[in-house]
Amino acid sequence: NEKAAQAAGIAYDKVVLFPASHAAYYPGAQSMAMKVLYEKKSLRLLGAQIVGGDGVDKRIDVLATAIRAKMTALELTELDLSYAPPYSSAKDPVNMAGFMIEDLESGKVQQFHWNDVEDLPCDGSATLLDVRTEGEYRRGHLNGFRNIPLDDLREHLDELERDKPVYVNCQTGLRSYLACRLLTQYGFSCSHLSGGYSFYQVVTQEQQTARSAYPCGMEKL
């Protein structure tokens, strides 16, 4: 995990994704939260954590085997895993983690993490953009982020300043990735929030709970 990598002095990065347990069009798909760590220099896999129900065990088994085999993160893209709509997707979540790392390391996209959010410039020197729907934005959003839904982004490009870096957020990281690819093609310097608002909300709430309660769960007075 990250604490072990930090204790070992390893320069690492991570990807966070929320894939479905099997093809989303087939009934009964469940969401899972995946985090995959890799070493920056060698790209070797360091570890993985998955939270969910159906399908979690086999993805962990695949990743554990890949780590044991000393595979690089990019080699995850080449794994030809079993597929049928009730059990997986044409591109398995393990493949998708590899593709995300490939995009990062090739420079196609840049990301920032939940613990970077409070350090983002709020003085107008950067554009903070939330590309979720208006309803999602109203239910909760990061301070200082302006809402332009992804479907409307092309119509609002002239409102964004190209000489300012853009930090993009969505619910799980997919729409912010797509927004960054679009903005990059139009000449913007762009980064998106790894794991999106969902991951940020879970992690920060857990930290708040940890600070205000004892390990047993009793609130501190």
Segment roles from a protein language model:
Residues 129:
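Active-site flanking residues adjacent to catalytic metal/cofactor-binding acidic residues
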Residues 6, 67, 184:
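Anion (oxyanion) recognition and catalysis
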